[in-house]
């Protein structure tokens, strides 16, 4: 496993995930009867600061259809959590107009790169072009100075 599991932290994420799903109207318990489901949800609400009991609640009461989605959500959250610790793996977001994103994505596909790699290449291309223009401008100025002195 690439990322270490932190049981207490992840238990809090699971609790928050289940509460969010409940508030969105999804059935988070495996109970068919409404009163049993409501009792289980009320128990869950009281367990926010008790990670071990949250895990027990999940084993006892959680709707099994949520299990896979919750695992995927927690796995993604764990990855983001550990990647955020290091500057080089931390993700940043930028706002792009849709047409700009579309053109960037098409360029990335043509080059066989990720969006990030394509952006880096575009920046490097622009820097090389700027450096080349500065060199040409300097050479042109030197040439004018030389020709201007001789004439």
UniProtKB/Swiss-Prot annotation:
Coiled-coil features, chain-numbered ranges: none
Keywords: Cell cycle, Cell division, Cytoplasm, DNA-binding
InterPro entries: Arc_rbn_hlx_hlx, MatP, MatP_C, MatP_N, MatP_N_sf
MF GO annotations: sequence-specific DNA binding
One GO cellular component term: cytoplasm
Primary site of residence: cytoplasm
One BP term from GO: regulation of DNA-templated transcription
Location in or out of the cell: Cytoplasm
Source superkingdom: Bacteria
Role: Required for spatial organization of the terminus region of the chromosome (Ter macrodomain) during the cell cycle. Prevents early segregation of duplicated Ter macrodomains during cell division. Binds specifically to matS, which is a 13 bp signature motif repeated within the Ter macrodomain.
Record note on quaternary structure: Homodimer.
Family: Belongs to the MatP family.
NCBIfam families registered for this protein in UniProt: PRK05097.1
Name this polypeptide is given: Macrodomain Ter protein
Source organism per UniProt: Yersinia enterocolitica serotype O:8 / biotype 1B (strain NCTC 13174 / 8081)
Lineage per the UniProt record: Bacteria, Pseudomonadati, Pseudomonadota, Gammaproteobacteria, Enterobacterales
The gene coding this protein: matP
């Amino acid at each position: 496993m690439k990322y270490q599991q932190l049981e207490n932290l992840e238990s809090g994420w699971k609790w928050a995930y289940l509460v969010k799903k409940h508030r969105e109207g999804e059935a988070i318990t495996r109970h068919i009867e409404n009163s049993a489901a409501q009792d289980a949800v009320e128990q869950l609400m009281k367990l926010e600061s008790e990670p071990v009991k949250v895990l027990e609640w999940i084993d006892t009461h959680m709707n099994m259809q949520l299990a896979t989605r919750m695992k995927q959500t927690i796995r993604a959250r764990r990855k983001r959590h550990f990647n955020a610790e290091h500057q080089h793996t931390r993700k940043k977001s930028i706002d792009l107009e849709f047409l700009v994103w579309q053109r960037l994505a098409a360029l990335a596909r043509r080059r066989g790169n990720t969006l990030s790699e394509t952006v880096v290449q575009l920046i490097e291309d622009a820097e090389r072009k700027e450096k080349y223009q500065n060199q040409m401008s300097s050479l042109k100025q030197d040439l004018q100075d030389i020709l201007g002195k001789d004439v």
